[in-house]
Structure formats: structure tokens, C-alpha cells
Amino acid sequence: MTALSVTVAGQPFDMMGYIAEQSILGIFFKSAYDAFNFENNVLTKITDADYPGWSTVTPTSITRSGSTATVTMPAAVNWQSGSTVTIAGAAETEYNGDFVISVTDPTHFDYEVTGTPTTPATGTITATGGRTTVPGVVYLDGYFFVMDSNAVVYNSALNDPTSWDALDFITAAIEPGGGVAITKTQNYVIAMKEWSTEFFYDVGNATGSPLSPVLSAFTLIGCAAGESVAELDETVYWISKARQRGPAVHKMVGLEQQLVSTPDIDRILATSDLSSVYAYGIKISGHSFYVLGLRDIDVTLAFDATSGTWAQWTSLTAQAPKSCTLSQSGGVATAACTAHGYADGAAVTIAGANESEYNGLHQIRAISANAFSFSVDSSATSPATGTITATGYDEGYFLYSHYVAAAGRDLVLHETTGDLVEISPAYYTDDGVPIALKLRTGKLDGDQEDFKSLGQIRVIGDKQGGEAMLRWSDDDYQTSSSCRPVDLSSEQARIRRCGAFRRRSFELLHIADLPVQLESLELG
């Protein structure tokens, strides 16, 4: 079974389906603080005191001796020394706040207070605390496994995710470090820690955890972000880290770990603080992708496991419309639009023209700060009439941050609108919004730095896709030439008179709502 991650009320939840008694489908799902079970159309919160979650309890009393407050609980809790507990509701406000506690026994803990508040405390007092679980939930041989931030792996009762026992745990303790994520490969439970990875298998112990460690599989490769862990084709991917190097991406097949990120990808990862990450695996048109979102740097990376290559996935978000006027000559429309701010080769949607030939999505050529042009049917009346607007787009990280396969369809969830949409090679827009395709080559010099004259560039590929734009850079990507249109559907998809260069990189841009499949650029 594969775990699914979703976000509810701002909290990420890990979900695991299972077959309960009488062939009833059940779902166990948990956040870092709470857990629930859905079975036979009944939703039950996991309230077992031995489950490593958070709870809010009304203390029996809070007393003070000197600067030490002692809390008496009505029943045993699994809270730990060194964890933080929130006290609220005391009439004597010195007792209230977030405090690091020292547990003296299962029903008592102490914390330090300032001042000399009256003892015992009065008011409607609550104490909120517990253990925080890391991302991931594992199902193995009828048990559910979760791990807390101290790298303690807990298991449920057999075939019952609502029941947990105080003795049913095992600690990943070969190497120091906190727990970061828990996952599974084949029949092994994987405890991913800050600087290491430990493996466990089910040996059927009569008491305590059914797991025992696989000592020979231990590695000194840890996990940098629990939310980066994703499963795809019986392979686990994650952002890794080790004491000798920064973040990278590894994959695990069985017990074997392999680096899949390149130095370029590692440099991108190093610019992120990894505080807001999402990841999932998805298969499209025979290709398997590990999708990794880094929200803090506005980047989504996608590793194509089939070809072994990396790409960047983006989403376009519509800007506010701007007023413009339009005219055309010879099949080229010119838009006058004050301070439009659109980049050369960008996607722009024209609306409101009475002459419908102007309306729709266009890939523009920036003429100046106040004008741009695009291709249009040469029969369009000029100038255009109507209340005409131009809408550009901001490009950012891929906004579809969760994935699920359901009813034979691949569905992704838009993280801001909540739209659940199908992702398919048959669609060429993101739910009506353009998809920006950008292909960039490395720097080409023909193994020598003499000036080279380039008479033409031909785009080799299927004769489909409509218009695209070509441009190039002769100064190590610092600046680019103006975009030049090329008709990908033409038998001779090419541009001529391409100047001279010593070293040049090429870039092709495409935004049309049409299929495109390209192979290479032919320089001549």
C-alpha cells in the first residue's frame, strides 16, 4: 500500500488505506499532532493515551513551590521531559504560556514560573502537549507504524489502528539524530533521521514492537526534509543530507541508495531553507516523475526517472488585465499598452476586441515598454475596435502540490484554489491557463572559439505545435537576443540570418494550446 499526503486546514496529513474486517475499506490518517480512523462510514479520533500525538487535558491541579510549578494530571499521559506544553486558562497569569517541562512520573510534570503566583492555581485550566510525529505512515503485516521526532517508531495493535500500547515501540538508535520521516521499501520499515537511515523488518516479537533492526543496511545518509519523501515505482525518493555535504536527492530501491541529483540540482537545493517542501511521484505517457516543490525559492523540480533527466515545472498565474489598442499590418498585430511589463516571448491573452481574430492566447514580441506585437490573421480589420484588454501571467513554482490516482485517472490538487484536476498528456493547458515550455541548450562552440557564421536554425520534430519563439545568448546567459517566431507546423520550421558567435546557447519558447514534440536544433 502507498501512503497519500493531503493538507487540511493548513495541516499536512498522511493517509493509508487498508482492508478492515469483513472486507470493509478503512483509512488511517494522521498529522504531526492528531490521528483519525475512518471505517464503515464512521470517523474516529485516536484518543488512546499511548498514541504519540497531542492532546488537551484539564489538570487536576497546579501547585507551586518556589519557582517550580507542579502539574497533576487526571490520568497518565505519554508526554516527555524536554517537550513544550502550553498552559492556558489560569487566573494567575504567571502560570500561563509555553513551557519546557520535566516529567516526574506519568501523571506529573514540572515547569518553571516567574513571580510568586498564588498556589494552587485557579481558573478553567488546560494543558496541551504530547509527542510530534514526523511525515509518513507505514502499513506492514497488519500493523500501522508512525515515528516521532525523537526517532521512536510506534506500532498499533494488529489490524486495529485505534489501539496503541505503551510498550509497542522501537527506537532508531544506531546513530544520534532526530526522526525526520518514516516510509517503507518492500517489506522493510525505513526510519529516516537527520544524518542516517535505519531499516527494520517484522520478526514477530511476542511482546513490544514486532520490528527488529536490519543492522547491515544502516547508512549515514539522512533526510533533510520529511515532506520530500515520495514513492514511485517501488522506489523511494527524498532530499538527502550527510555531515560531509549539503542537500541532494537520493533514491532507494530495496535497501540500495543511489544519488540522482546533479551538481546543478544540488546548487538549487542549497539555496532553499527546505522549510516549505512538497513531493510526489507520478507517471505520464510512460515516464515516471519525482516532483519536488521548493516554495521558499519559488521552484519546482521534476526528475524523469525514465530518462534520468531533470526539468523545472512551473505554473502561470494571470495578472490584472491592462487596457490596450490594436492594429495590424501583414499578419503582425501591434498593441499599444502603457507600461505593460511583459517579457519578450511571454504569454498574453487578448480579450474584448470586436474582431475575434485578435482575441485569445498569443506569444508576444516585446517592442518597447509600451508596445508589443504578435501574429494574427492578415485579414483582421485594422484598427481593432471594442474594449480591449491584455492579460499577462506571472510564472512561479508548480501549484499542483498533491497527487492521487483514483478511478483510473491521475489527479492533482491546486494548493490555492482547491481544484482537483486530471493531469494528462492530452491536455495542453493548466486548467485553462497556458503552459510555458522553455527548452535551453548548453553553450555550443564546436570545440573551438573562432567566430562562426550561422545561416539558419531548423527545428527538428513533429510537424505540429503552431508558432514558437527562438532566441539565443552569446554571453553566458547574461542577455538574450530578441525572440524570433518559427512555425513548428511548417515543413521547413526554421529561421534565417542568425549572425555570428564564438559560443552560443539557444532557447525555444512555446505557449500554444497545442501538442509539441521536438527532437533537436539543426544549425547550418
Q: Each predicted region: which residue ranges?
A:
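N-terminal assembly/attachment segments of tailed bacteriophage virion structural proteins
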Residues: 1-28, 32-37, 41, 48, ...
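Recurrent small/Gly-Pro-centered beta-turn motifs in extracellular repeat architectures
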Residues: 29-31, 113, 148, 193, ...
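A short loop-to-beta-strand structural motif that recurs across blades of beta-propeller domains
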Residues: 34, 99, 196, 247-250, ...
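Predominantly extracellular/luminal cell-surface or secreted proteins
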Residues: 38, 86-90, 112-114, 154-159, ...
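Small/polar beta-strand repeat architecture
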Residues: 48-132, 319-394
